[in-house]
Every structure is written in structure tokens, then in C-alpha cells.
Design a protein with these regions (language model features):
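Beta1/beta-strand and adjacent pyrophosphate-binding region of the FAD-binding site
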Residues: 25-41, 63
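Small-residue (primarily alanine) positions within well-ordered alpha-helices
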Residues: 41, 45-50
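Glycine-rich active-site loop/strand segments that organize a redox cofactor
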Residues: 79-129
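Short beta-strand to alpha-helix junction loop
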Residues: 101-109, 129-148, 158
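A conserved short coil-to-beta-strand element within the FAD-binding core of flavoproteins
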Residues: 159-170
Length: 171
């Protein structure tokens, strides 16, 4: 018996499936850490927060709110769809405001970025001008390792939700 081909979903069917998946996520009304935006920076921030809570043996809730139907969609467009996730030649003097870049990036930027992605299980190559890409040359590889690590860390991914207001409480 010939193997059946898997039916490819239309864009509408895929979006409906993602919307149903997003609606099924239970979002707490109170969280220890809320990250608005589920792109690369938001996912990385949420992972770092969730793992810090775990390391401190402090049970906590980390939630990422993403307006789109799925987290990490913006990653897919970076680097021409290949995701240039780092550059081995990041020097503050290459930027318009080197002092600002130095204060944000610091001296350990590349080492920390590569350590983070190595821990995620991402393998990469370095191409011309120091651009670093996943060995698959597919941006989805970067998105997938970030989503996997976020879920492993217990991050709640609340997609298809737009934030209008956040209230803070002191503890």
C-alpha cells in the first residue's frame, strides 16, 4: 500500500490552527515576569528570566505576550531567511554612538551569545564579514531552538494577544 501524502494546509487553515492553539494556552492573571513581544529578544529575555528563577529555586511565572499568531515569526525574515544571529566582529567603533554600544554590548557580548546558543543546541557557521548563521542556513533553526528552550524553561507563550495595559504590584 502506497504511503499517503500529508495534505498541505492552506494559509487560512494554518492560521486557524495557530489561533486555536493560542486560545488553548492558559494565561495567568498574575505573573512574576511579563515580556511583551515574542521575537528573538523577547524569547531570549523570557528564557533568561525563567532560568534565573529556576536557578534561585524560586517558583515563578514568566509569560511572553505576542500579538502575532506564533512567537518567533520575525526571526524567519532575518538574514534573508537564514538568520544572521551574531557577528564575530562587533566593535563599538563600527557604530554611530560607540559609547552607547559599549555600555550595552560590553566586552563579553559574542562569548555570551555563542554560549547561550550552544546551550540551546544550535550549531553555526561563520561566513564572510564575520556573519554567523545556523549550519542549516535556515532561520527556522534559530526560532526552533529558542522556542524549545523557552518551553523547557516553563515560559508561557501567549500568542495572538495584544497588550493594552500592564499593572504592577509590589512585593
Amino acid at each position: 500500500m502506497a504511503a499517503q501524502r500529508k495534505k498541505r494546509l492552506s494559509r487560512t487553515e494554518k492560521n486557524n490552527a495557530l489561533l486555536a492553539q493560542a486560545a488553548a494556552v492558559k494565561v495567568p492573571s498574575v505573573a512574576d515576569v511579563v515580556v511583551v513581544g515574542g521575537g528573538a529578544s523577547g524569547l531570549t529575555a523570557a528564557i533568561s528570566a525563567a532560568e534565573a528563577l529556576q536557578d534561585a529555586k524560586h517558583p515563578g511565572t514568566v509569560v511572553v505576550f505576542e500579538r502575532a499568531l506564533e512567537c518567533g515569526r520575525t526571526i524567519l525574515a532575518t538574514g534573508g531567511g537564514r538568520c544572521n544571529f551574531a557577528n564575530e566582529d562587533v566593535r563599538p567603533e563600527n557604530y554611530r554612538h560607540p559609547a552607547f554600544v559599549r555600555s550595552v554590548v560590553g566586552g563579553k557580548y559574542l562569548k555570551e551569545v555563542l554560549s547561550f546558543f550552544r546551550t540551546c543546541g544550535l550549531a553555526w557557521i561563520t561566513e564572510d564579514e564575520g556573519r554567523m548563521y545556523p549550519v542549516t542556513r535556515e532561520a527556522s533553526s534559530v526560532r526552533d531552538v529558542l522556542l524549545t528552550r523557552a518551553k523547557k524553561a516553563g515560559v508561557i507563550l501567549a500568542c495572538a494577544r495584544e497588550i493594552v495595559d500592564i499593572q504592577t504590584t509590589s512585593q
